[in-house]
Amino acid sequence: MTKGPIRLDVAVSYALPRAGLPSAVSFRKWVAAALKGRIREADLAVRLVDEKEGCSLNHHYRGKDYATNVLSFPAELPEGLPKGIKMPLLGDLVICAPVVAREAAEQGKSLAAHYAHLTVHGTLHLLGWDHDDDKEADAMEQLEREILADLGIDDPYAGEQ
């Protein structure tokens, strides 16, 4: 676990009208919470998209013909870098705004809390966390709960068991 301040650059882009969407400041806060104690320096991008772009990306990268809530694209270090060189580039998150809004309404969650959860979830994927099996899923979900609790956000998995 690392201590001390995080040097963090979060570039947020909106591929749809910004009305009703979280601010870049909010995304930075949520990413910082996910990284706290885990990494000291990071650059990443968050892109908010419509369903058409979300579906296209999900099809291209995962072979799924629907838009999903969040996609994580970890950065890959360029070949040929000298050993020991560390690059702060963590990767990209793509968040499909209409899917997030629909899920929040269906699940009775505040929109901000759902965006926070998905941003934390996606950021953990960039750090290498996954949920391919029950054990991994349980560990990742517990970490998400802890991070969100630190942000004052209720357990996103409450009532799912």
Swiss-Prot record:
Please indicate which superkingdom the organism of origin belongs to. Answer: Bacteria
Positions contributing to Zn(2+) binding: H121, H125, H131
EC class of this enzyme? hydrolase
- What residue ranges carry the coiled-coil annotation? none
**Entry-linked PROSITE patterns:** UPF0054
Q: Where in the cell is it found?
A: Cytoplasm
Explain how, and how many, cofactor molecules are bound: Binds 1 zinc ion.
Task: Please name the GO terms of the biological process aspect recorded for this protein, alphabetically.
Answer: rRNA processing
Provide the alphabetized UniProt keywords: Cytoplasm, Endonuclease, Hydrolase, Metal-binding, Nuclease, Ribosome biogenesis, rRNA processing, Zinc
Q: Which cofactor does it need?
A: Zn(2+)
Disulfide linkage = none
Q: What does this protein do?
A: Single strand-specific metallo-endoribonuclease involved in late-stage 70S ribosome quality control and in maturation of the 3' terminus of the 16S rRNA.
Annotated family:
Belongs to the endoribonuclease YbeY family.
Protein name, please? Endoribonuclease YbeY
**Which species expresses this protein natively?**
Xanthomonas oryzae pv. oryzae (strain KACC10331 / KXO85)
Q: Which gene encodes it?
A: ybeY
